[in-house]
Each structure stands twice: as structure tokens, then as C-alpha cells.
């Protein structure tokens, strides 16, 4: 779960990261009132996307009236397809230098990684291109974590100014607490700023929380803003489905994350010869492919206007293919007139022959059965491009 800046800063404050919270405003009036309290402010769009400044979503306001004007312009704008419904009114800071700092999960190497740079305030990818030596990558042993000695190593490696060493060490330790104690997969500060008087402060923040650890953090539910979530992802979550919306036109249903990921790949490959068709989603129904689960999955996918065809790819294991086939037939009966797009079904594994027989006898006009994964992907891409 990605957090907005103001939410990330709340976690920073909780763990003693130096930060000023500011005031969240939903209307121009609220923005003006906040600026009257804070003085010179920065009006910052709150969306889960980068590039807010380039998009015109971050503006300096020297008066409350100017804050109101900026809020009027920013509220309702779209940044990378996301509508801005709130702004953060943050006190303007006198910045002397800007640094970059992050902890993240390095999945490829099965470890944590710290990235730090004394050239912050801009996209770290750009710094890595123009001055790679300024971007330091420090691996973190998951067993050892970050203690004071490791924090000092990080600060020294990143070449933070000597005058800021002690503050930087304490800030690194505090950010590590955010990362570990909140079960985050990313904690990023850009910029971590040196203010007048050699004071360090996190002026912006980005945090991604591991949704698999939600059971340990009931308090994280307060970060969920339902009206800002993708409606299809919200509907899938309510039904207990593992769904991620993508930008293609072939809906994907499979049992098992590995199989679904492979299905995305073969559909993308097949789509290259069918007008650039791509997968529309990731949807893993797991092992319980009964009629209701299939109906729930199909209902979510068919609710995506971009979907032109659906590829159901199932390998029967614990859940036999005849159960899956009965689930598909039952799902189509449940959906009735809501089922309007062609389905390509590929069954393999336990009781696959019986599953195919059930679907053949049902003879639903929307269903096409294909024996191979590549063939089914090609057919689904063809139908989506028809």
C-alpha cells in the first residue's frame, strides 16, 4: 500500500524522524485558513505519484490569498492519471542543501538496500545517470539490520557533511525504525534538507507498506482512502481476490501467482502480432475455484471497460479441473446477461479431460476452449483485437 506524503510524514513523526507535518486541506477555503496559521507555505498536491512539481502540483504561496489561488488550481487537476482531492499546506523552509535517502526491499538479492546521496531534491534516477558516484548503495543484512555502527557507516559512505553527522545518524536510525516496525517495503525521503542553523528535516516522504503484513497493523487501516482507490481493485479486495489492474485489454484469471505471471508474459508476447494487445490485469483465484469465486473474478474483470476478452488459465492440482469447469459454468449462470465478452479457457492437469467435457456439454456461446497455453493466449489476443 502506497501512502500519500502527509501519511508518510505521520509515520515519520511517530518514529522521531525530524519532520513538520503541515495541514491537509480539501478546499481552497481550508488552504487559505491553513496558510493564515502557518505563514509562507508550500501548497502540495497529495497523490500517490511522483513528478508532482513538474506537473504544477507544488507551489510556493507567500500570502493566504495566494495559497487559496494555488489550491484552486491544484485541486481537481490530474497527475499521472490521478485526481488531486487534497493538498498539504506545509510551512516553507529555508533550504541550504538537499540530500536523498531511502531504505527498500532488494528482492533480486534477498536483502535490504539503503540508497543515499548528497545530491537530492531531484529524481534520484537522473542523479544516477549524470553523477553515478554521488549515489551510494549500501546493502543491509536482514539479520543484523541497522544499528548505530551501521548508521555511521551509511552516513560516512554517503559523504554527509561532518557538521550533520550526529543528526544524520539519528535520522537514519529513525527511518530504519519506520521501515522495520511498520513493515514497509520502501521508505524514501527526497529531499532530506539541511536548513538554516544546520538542522536536518524530511521535507517530503514516500512510504510503501507491505499489505501481507496488514494483520500486524490494524492502525494502517486509517491510511486507506476508499474513494481514491481503483474501484475494481477495491471490489476485488472486498471479495478476497488478489487483483491488480493493468492497462491492457485481455482479462486474466489463473490459479496461482506463478501461473498468472506466466500468463501475463505469454499474452503480452502473443499480443505483439495482434495490434499490441496487452494483459488487462493480474487475478489469482488461488485454489478455491468454485462457482462463486469464478463469478466474483469474472464480475470484477468484466467491470473493466478496457477488457475485450478474458483468458482463464487453470492448472488443476489440489483443485481439479472438473471443479473449475463447473465453477465456470456456474459463474456464467450467476452472471447471466452481465457476461458479454468472449472467454478463452485452457485447462490442464488434474481431471482436465473431464473439465473440458463439462464445458463442451455446456456449449456456452461465449466460451472457446484451447488446449495449449500459447494457443489460448494467441486466441485471447486475437479476440481482444477483433
Swiss-Prot record:
Binds 1 Mg(2+) ion per subunit. ATP binds at residues 44, 51-53, 93, 98. InterPro entries: ATP-grasp, ATP-grasp_succ-CoA_synth-type, ATP_grasp_subdomain_1, Succ-CoA_synthase_bsu_CS, SUCC_ACL_C, Succ_CoA_ligase-like_bsu, Succinyl-CoA_synth-like. Its cofactor is Mg(2+). Gene3D superfamilies: ATP-grasp fold, A domain, ATP-grasp fold, B domain, Succinyl-CoA synthetase domains. Residues 9-235 form the ATP-grasp domain. Pfam families: ATP-grasp_2, Ligase_CoA. Pathway: Carbohydrate metabolism; tricarboxylic acid cycle; succinate from succinyl-CoA (ligase route): step 1/1. One of its GO terms (biological process) is tricarboxylic acid cycle. Substrate binds at residues 255, 317-319. Keywords: ATP-binding, Ligase, Magnesium, Metal-binding, Nucleotide-binding, Tricarboxylic acid cycle. One of its GO terms (molecular function) is succinate-CoA ligase (GDP-forming) activity. The keyword Hydrolase does not apply. Its EC number is 6.2.1.5. It catalyses: succinate + ATP + CoA = succinyl-CoA + ADP + phosphate; GTP + succinate + CoA = succinyl-CoA + GDP + phosphate. It comes from the Bacteria. Mg(2+) binds at residues 190, 204. GO terms for cellular component: cytosol; succinate-CoA ligase complex. Succinyl-CoA synthetase functions in the citric acid cycle (TCA), coupling the hydrolysis of succinyl-CoA to the synthesis of either ATP or GTP and thus represents the only step of substrate-level phosphorylation in the TCA. The beta subunit provides nucleotide specificity of the enzyme and binds the substrate succinate, while the binding sites for coenzyme A and phosphate are found in the alpha subunit. HAMAP family: Succ_CoA_beta (MF_00558). Belongs to the succinate/malate CoA ligase beta subunit family. PANTHER family: SUCCINATE--COA LIGASE [GDP-FORMING] SUBUNIT BETA, MITOCHONDRIAL, SUCCINYL-COA SYNTHETASE BETA CHAIN. Heterotetramer of two alpha and two beta subunits. This is Succinate--CoA ligase [ADP-forming] subunit beta. The gene is sucC.
Amino acid at each position: 500500500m502506497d501512502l500519500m506524503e502527509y501519511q508518510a510524514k505521520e509515520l515519520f513523526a511517530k518514529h522521531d524522524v525530524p519532520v513538520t507535518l503541515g495541514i491537509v486541506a480539501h478546499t481552497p477555503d481550508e488552504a487559505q485558513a491553513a496558510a493564515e496559521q502557518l505563514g509562507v507555505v508550500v501548497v502540495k498536491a497529495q497523490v500517490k505519484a511522483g513528478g508532482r512539481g513538474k506537473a504544477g502540483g507544488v507551489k510556493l504561496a507567500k500570502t493566504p490569498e495566494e495559497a487559496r489561488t494555488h489550491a484552486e488550481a491544484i485541486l481537481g487537476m490530474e497527475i499521472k492519471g490521478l485526481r488531486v482531492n487534497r493538498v498539504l499546506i506545509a510551512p516553507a523552509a529555508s533550504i541550504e542543501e538537499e540530500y536523498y535517502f531511502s531504505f527498500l526491499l532488494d528482492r533480486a538479492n534477498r536483502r535490504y538496500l539503503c540508497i543515499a546521496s548528497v545530491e537530492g531534491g531531484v529524481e534520484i534516477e537522473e542523479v544516477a545517470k549524470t553523477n553515478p558516484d554521488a549515489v551510494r548503495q549500501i546493502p543491509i543484512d536482514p539479520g543484523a539490520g541497522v544499528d548505530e555502527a551501521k548508521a555511521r557507516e551509511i552516513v560516512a559512505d554517503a559523504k554527509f557533511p561532518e557538521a550533520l553527522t550526529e543528526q544524520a545518524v539519528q535520522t537514519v536510525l529513525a527511518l530504519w525504525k519506520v521501515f522495520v516496525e511498520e513493515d514497509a517495503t520502501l521508505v524514501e525521503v527526497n529531499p532530506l534538507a539541511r536548513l538554516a542553523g544546520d538542522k536536518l528535516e524530511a521535507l517530503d516522504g514516500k512510504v510503501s507498506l507491505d499489505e501481507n503484513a496488514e494483520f500486524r497493523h490494524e492502525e494502517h487501516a486509517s491510511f486507506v482512502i476508499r474513494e481514491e482507490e481503483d474501484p475494481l481493485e477495491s471490489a476485488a479486495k472486498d471479495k478476497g481476490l488478489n487483483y491488480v489492474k493493468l492497462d491492457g485489454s485481455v482479462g486474466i484469471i489463473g490459479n496461482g501467482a506463478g501461473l498468472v505471471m506466466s500468463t501475463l508474459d505469454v499474452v503480452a508476447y502473443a499480443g505483439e502480432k495482434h495490434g499490441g494487445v496487452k494483459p488487462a490485469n493480474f487475478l489469482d483465484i488461488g485454489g478455491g475455484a468454485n462457482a462463486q469465486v469464478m463469478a466474483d473474478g469474472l464480475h470484477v474483470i468484466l467491470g473493466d471497460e478496457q477488457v475485450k476478452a478474458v483468458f482463464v488459465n487453470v492448472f488443476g492440482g489440489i483443485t481439479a479441473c472438473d471443479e473449475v469447469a463447473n465453477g465456470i459454468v456456474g459463474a456464467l449462470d450467476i452472471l447471466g446477461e452481465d457476461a458479454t465478452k468472449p472467454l478463452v479457457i485452457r485447462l490442464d492437469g488434474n481431471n482436465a479431460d473431464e473439465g473440458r467435457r463439462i464445458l463442451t456439454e455446456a456449449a456456452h456461446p461465449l466460451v472457446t476452449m484451447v488446449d495449449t497455453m500459447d494457443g489460448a493466449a494467441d486466441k485471447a489476443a486475437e479476440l481482444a483485437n477483433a
